[in-house]
Amino acid sequence: APTRDWAARRNAPVVNAYLYDIREDVARRQRGQMAVRDEDDIVVRRRQPPRWFRLSYLVTAWTKTPQDEHRLLSAVLATLLPREIMPPSELPGSLGALGLSVPLTVAGIQTESRSLAEIWSALGGELKPSLDLVVVTPWDLDRAMPAAPPVTERPRISLHDRDGRDDL
């Protein structure tokens, strides 16, 4: 966390991303099951959809002068603004393996219950220019059930009358 002690120990320009809040994005919650298909497009498993969480970060720049901090934050903002969505190919490990894009919001409207000034006060640090970065990320519940084998035979239909005779 960017506390006074942490700030006193740094000796080079630093961009710090401090995770200050985690909340489920209940608007994205889905019910039911999703089909997992193999390379032949055959359903091999069914799984619960992932749960989505809003991760809120306080992004700050730490240098010797305020002007350098502003320039560094400007560079961070210029890097993040065009990136409204991160595709699965750019996500690490199991997060990328889900095949879902991850939306980013930078310097958006503060909708969480705590203001950034309250966060700074709780950290015991001086108020600094910062960016609020919100990453909405899926959490894989890893609850998959194998699907039954696909039906490969054609259906057989036979008609009988009430007495069981086939002469219909």
Identify the role of each PLM range.
Residues 1, 7, 105, 128, ...:
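Basic, low-complexity intrinsically disordered segments
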Residues 1-35, 94-95, 99:
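Small/polar-rich, solvent-exposed N-terminal microdomains that initiate assembly or binding
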Residues 1-3, 41-42, 115-118:
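Short structured motifs
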Residues 1-4, 31-34, 47, 92-96, ...:
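Hydrophobic/basic alpha-helical segments enriched in Actinobacteria
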Residues 12-16, 52-58, 101, 128-132:
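Broad gene-expression machinery/nucleic-acid interaction feature
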Residues 9-10, 46-52, 123-127:
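Short glycine/proline-enriched loop/turn "hinge" motifs that connect secondary-structure elements
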Residues 40-100, 138-168:
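Charged, amphipathic alpha-helical segments and their flanking helix caps
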Residues 71, 81-136:
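Acidic-leaning, charged glycine-interspersed low-complexity segments
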